[in-house]
């Protein structure tokens, strides 16, 4: 999910085989209705091919759902798949000794945070994630701003120290 620009589990679960053309997944975000196109990196394509639905009669790209989209059965299957996925992620986090609980949204937040640390503009991050506004994206990034500011301050102080030729210690 992190390799797919932090795609939410709900969008991943409802992806159709027809949404994948060559190395591009095109879909509409279920939450906002915004159309998105994700160009798959070679790493992402390897994972898509590994986990894609092998049932030729299923319209879904991944084997989370069996029932027709829009039915109560499909929604129930989605809820069960999400619960199972999150339980497996929590177990993985415990096995790895992570202090924080992992969830499907961890991948989404990780993508946004990593993009921010790579100094990608929040507007690009917002667009990539299909947010309705940059304000939504900023709520993801707010906890990390002070750390970035501290890092910037350290760089400035180090630069001044080097430029002062040892006058500042």
Describe each PLM feature range.
Residues 1-7, 114:
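Short pre-functional
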Residues 4, 14-50:
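Conserved tyrosine-mediated DNA breakage-rejoining catalytic core shared by Y-recombinases
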Residues 10-13, 125:
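Alpha-helix N-cap/helix-start motif at helix boundaries, enriched for small hydrophobics
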Residues 18-26, 98-100, 120-139, 164-169:
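Short, polar N-cap/turn motifs at the start of nucleic acid-interacting alpha helices
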Residues 26-39, 72-81, 99-106:
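Short, contiguous acidic/charged loop-to-helix segments that flank catalytic cores in large enzymes
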Residues 29-33, 68, 129-154:
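Catalytic-site neighborhood detector that most strongly recognizes the C-terminal catalytic loop/helix
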Residues 50, 56, 64-72, 155-169:
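C-terminal secondary-structure termini that scaffold catalytic or DNA-interacting sites
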Residues 86-127:
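Short, basic (Lys/Arg/His-rich) helix/loop patches that form interaction surfaces
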